[in-house]
Design a protein with these regions (language model features):
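Positively charged, amphipathic and often flexible ligand-engagement surfaces
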Residues: 1-308
Length: 308
């Protein structure tokens, strides 16, 4: 079945109470560990060290989104500052961080979110670390890009993700500040057909086209996909145009297509893995299941294996 068409049924399944109890219970935890480094920063750093041994860099993501009170956003800022402090004392690891703006208070106000992001960016600037902004559902795109553009006026080391499943993303690319750092992703949220493409072919074609456009216009591009055809297409485009590899990076998710991660790293390409950690891992995990049928099959088959 087509990936975008399958996403809805899978996400509805993960909303069922019995499914959540299964995943978060004793049987599910060993499988969750494949996709989430753990609930603590130490777990994420341990995963980063293992990846470093494979010539793979790391982007840390302290899981959480749509906080329900401003003080929870402040707590999230504290978690990121602690992560950045940890990066300071791990100088041999190539670590960056990624944040969701709804975790930093975007649902409450633009001003609160910007103030919280300023604290994170100031801590990151002290150690020269890049901070990436995750893109959330289509309802947040305008607000997310507004925050990004405002912060970009004062900070160089901040970037944002764009989703090729959304019909609007080509226009958003046209309005980016010069020399932006962009993570290009397919997108994992369930979206209505009026705002998102309905077929995998459309999403993949847009991914390839926008990756080429971003690179041709001088942006730094983090190509975030596990699709070998799109990865190979990027390599061909970069080499044909003689684009320096300092402007390109391949990014993948922790626990997914580790064979591909290792192959690219061993071939000398820059690879960075998105390492999530924290207690709020369930929404993240369910999106991973929905975006790739293979992930759902892996989870189900391993539940059976661990349950024996």
């Amino acid at each position: 079945m087509n990936g975008p068409l399958l996403r809805g049924p899978v996400l509805r399944l993960t909303e069922a109470g019995w499914f959540r109890r299964l995943v978060t219970g004793r049987l599910g935890r060993p499988v969750v560990a494949r996709f989430v480094a753990g609930e603590h920063l130490d777990d994420a750093v341990r995963a980063a060290k293992a990846l470093d041994g494979q010539k793979i860099s790391t982007i840390l993501d302290h899981l959480g989104e749509n906080v329900t009170a401003p003080e929870h956003a402040v707590e999230a800022v504290g978690a990121y500052v602690r992560a950045l402090d940890r990066i300071r004392v791990e100088p041999f690891l190539d670590l960056t961080v990624s944040v969701k703006l709804t975790q930093l208070g975007l649902d409450f106000s633009h001003e609160l979110c910007v103030a919280n992001m300023e604290r994170v960016l100031e801590a990151a600037a002290e150690i020269g670390t890049l901070v990436m902004i995750d893109m959330e559902s289509s309802a947040y795109v305008d607000r997310t890009l507004r925050v990004f553009r405002e912060l970009r006026e004062r900070h160089d080391r901040v970037g944002v993700a764009l989703q090729t499943c959304l019909r609007r993303t080509g226009r958003d690319v046209d309005e980016l500040p010069d020399g932006s750092v962009i993570r290009i992703v397919k997108g994992a949220y369930l979206e209505p057909p009026e705002v998102a493409f309905a077929t995998r072919r459309e999403v993949d074609t847009t991914f390839a086209q926008l990756t080429a456009t971003l690179l041709a216009r001088g942006h730094v591009v983090h190509v975030a996909t596990h699709d070998p055809a799109l990865l190979d297409g990027t390599v061909s485009f970069v080499e044909r145009r003689a684009i320096p590899w300092t402007r390109v990076e391949f990014q993948m998710l922790y626990g997914i297509r580790r064979d591909l991660q290792n192959r690219l790293a061993n071939e000398g390409y820059p690879v960075r893995v998105y390492v999530p950690y924290g207690t709020e891992w369930y929404p993240y995990l369910t999106r991973r299941m929905a975006e790739r049928p293979a992930n759902m099959w892996f989870f189900a088959s391993n539940l059976v294996r661990f349950g024996r």
